């Protein structure tokens, strides 16, 4: 199966009370995960935009930074991430990501079930 760029579902949404919107491109659609996960997206955050702090229960989330930099809340500890870095939020833990940089930040987001 090939999904062309123009066929991807795109959406803008506020997540977990974070400021601004995420700008997402859905790489897999619902039903394509074979009960292994629920999200595989490329997400862009503009300057000042964020995914608010939230907990994962029954699943885990991976962020891989493609472009730019961000402040990442790793279960209460803040660290700076840049292009090439990967952050994993295991089941039961909390995280958030905030674009503090001057330009856009892009990341791959993957949520897999426990």
Per-segment meaning from a language model:
Residues 58-60, 64-70:
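Glycine- and acidic-residue-biased ligand/ion/polar-headgroup-sensing regions
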Residues 77-91:
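Short acidic-glycine-tyrosine-enriched beta hairpin
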């Amino acid at each position: 199966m090939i999904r062309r760029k123009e066929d991807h579902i795109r959406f803008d949404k506020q997540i977990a009370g974070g400021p601004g919107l995420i700008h997402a491109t859905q790489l897999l659609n619902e039903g394509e995960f074979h009960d292994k996960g629920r999200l595989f997206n490329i997400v862009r955050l503009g300057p000042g935009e964020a995914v608010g702090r939230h907990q994962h229960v029954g699943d885990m989330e991976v962020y891989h930074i493609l472009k730019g930099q961000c402040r990442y809340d790793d279960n209460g500890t803040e660290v700076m991430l840049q292009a090439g870095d990967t952050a994993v939020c295991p089941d039961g833990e909390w995280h958030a990501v905030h674009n503090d940089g001057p330009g856009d930040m892009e990341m791959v987001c993957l949520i897999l079930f426990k």
